[in-house]
């Protein structure tokens, strides 16, 4: 019995550490692609946070504040997709860039809701800027998918 309890405790800890390391990897990936926004990118501050009505963040925030804001935003995005289980982080990262509504209404989310895990092409399809394929966005989507998708 003790061995079983020990195994369950170790498994729970390992799962939590794995989830934390995936979240950390996701945050670092976002930071790499977003970069720390300069004042001329207003209303975007930090690592791509769009200022909301009533928020008083300054456009010249330091890296520590920007990092904390990114993590808080990403956690909020992941909570929106908690019903998607292990895919909540993948969808949260995408929503960080394009918004929750677009992700929730997408064919990607529909396929996952229906149990279809063949979603690579749908995920990478979020690579357009003004209707044209962006090589940088395509690279970002491929990296996000490789990093966060677990089949």
Predicted regions and their residues:
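Short linear sequence motifs
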Residues: 4, 89, 116-119
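Long, amphipathic, charge-rich alpha-helical segments that form helical bundles/coiled-coils
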Residues: 88-102
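Long, amphipathic alpha-helical surface segments
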Residues: 18-37, 41, 49-84, 101-151
């Amino acid at each position: 019995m003790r061995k079983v309890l020990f195994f369950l405790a170790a498994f729970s800890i390992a799962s939590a550490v794995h989830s934390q390391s995936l979240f950390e990897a996701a945050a670092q990936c976002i930071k790499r692609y977003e970069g720390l926004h300069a004042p001329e990118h207003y209303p975007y501050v930090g690592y791509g946070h769009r200022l909301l009505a009533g928020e008083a963040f300054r456009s010249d925030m330091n890296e520590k504040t920007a990092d904390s804001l990114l993590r808080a935003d990403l956690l909020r995005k992941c909570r929106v997709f908690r019903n998607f289980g292990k895919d909540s982080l993948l969808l949260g990262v995408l929503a960080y860039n394009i918004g929750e509504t677009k992700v929730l209404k997408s064919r990607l989310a529909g396929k996952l809701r229906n149990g279809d895990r063949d979603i690579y092409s749908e995920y990478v399809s979020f690579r357009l800027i003004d209707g044209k394929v962006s090589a940088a966005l395509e690279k970002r989507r491929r990296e996000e998918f490789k990093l966060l998708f677990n089949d």
